[in-house]
Amino acid sequence: MTKQYKNYVNGEWKLSENEIKIYEPASGAELGSVPAMSTEEVDYVYASAKKAQPAWRSLSYIERAAYLHKVADILMRDKEKIGAVLSKEVAKGYKSAVSEVVRTAEIINYAAEEGLRMEGEVLEGGSFEAASKKKIAVVRREPVGLVLAISPFNYPVNLAGSKIAPALIAGNVIAFKPPTQGSISGLLLAEAFAEAGLPAGVFNTITGRGSEIGDYIVEHQAVNFINFTGSTGIGERIGKMAGMRPIMLELGGKDSAIVLEDADLELTAKNIIAGAFGYSGQRCTAVKRVLVMESVADELVEKIREKVLALTIGNPEDDADITPLIDTKSADYVEGLINDANDKGAAALTEIKREGNLICPILFDKVTTDMRLAWEEPFGPVLPIIRVTSVEEAIEISNKSEYGLQASIFTNDFPRAFGIAEQLEVGTVHINNKTQRGTDNFPFLGAKKSGAGIQGVKYSIEAMTTVKSVVFDIK
């Protein structure tokens, strides 16, 4: 019999009347079960968090930081245990899964330290007008209250920690909703917060079926801030339900790699492979299309093809480069994009092959803009090459996307690269490197349908706080 995992609510581990069974994407074996919470149980989570918030916010930054450092230490101690489960639950290579836990600990430690650098300021009215020269404003940051943190399946631990730690150090309380496929990993993360001894109600978890509690947890007026990573469709729905409440949304992307004539093609190919096929392409920041100058396209395509053929294919426990996708629905969607490109004349340079949820890495050359693969986000191991004849054409295609997360430019002409970067409608541009999240002290954001708000530890703390100004007159 597999393990029944529990939610952590108000300092206690709790089961629910109903449960959700979690299966491994690679083998189909049952990994365990998590509680399927009811709306009444959600009410209790939120009430517990609200009750705990005044005492938590009254602690100093240094006191809250001490709790977070304990959490990070526990995660480092248990990284192999958590990584082993994470690897099975989301079909991620074991080494990558352990690295995710380590990175989460690093983010939590950094957030604890960054909180100590959050300072207020004093403003003088005389800077605006002489009549107000005796007015002084003391400006401080205060927590928003209860933060609902919702993490995605592809990084259920890391993209939870990047939300939770900045919120907690700022004096907020947390209701953490892990993804259904990733819930067990999320509850293992919760064990670290529980063991660290945070006061009851400060950190809580919610697991359950989206059809039953998905809208309820977002619409609930106890929630003061919603921090979500996931699909654009769900993100847009959350935005509408949030109303006047602040939100942070990290959504989809169609990141372009623009390759100019003077690029180091070996470096370019290496980065494109890592960017496109890491975790089987199931990353919002994955390289999802290559826009290459026709004059160097043949040479680059051959280099990429050689590296695609060298990728290992198999199961997560083997640390294969390409592992099964998260579920059948996702694999079906990727297969649909592949078939559309193939039917419309794109040149498949590797074998088109699928076994269950496992899709072998596919490289398409001569993809055109009438193909779905040129525009839609596959979230799978398929990479389209689009040949262009000018920088202007590459910029135009890149900017026509409904998404605006990131882009890469490969060139040895850095002034030219900066000029192109200014024209790209994305949150981040990488020069001579793959698109990727991080480092986590950098701002991370998306334009258009790729998100709302700015992440990165300092920016996340600022987002999940509000400014209060206290004004008085000097006599």
Swiss-Prot record:
This is NADP-dependent glyceraldehyde-3-phosphate dehydrogenase. It holds the Pfam family Aldedh. The lineage of its organism: Bacteria, Bacillati, Bacillota, Bacilli, Lactobacillales. The keyword NADP applies. It catalyses: D-glyceraldehyde 3-phosphate + NADP(+) + H2O = (2R)-3-phosphoglycerate + NADPH + 2 H(+). It comes from Streptococcus mutans serotype c (strain ATCC 700610 / UA159). The keyword Transmembrane helix does not apply. Homotetramer. Substrate binds at residues 103, 154-155, 283-285, 437. NADP(+) binds at residues 151, 177, 180, 215, 230-251, 377. The active site is at 250, 284.
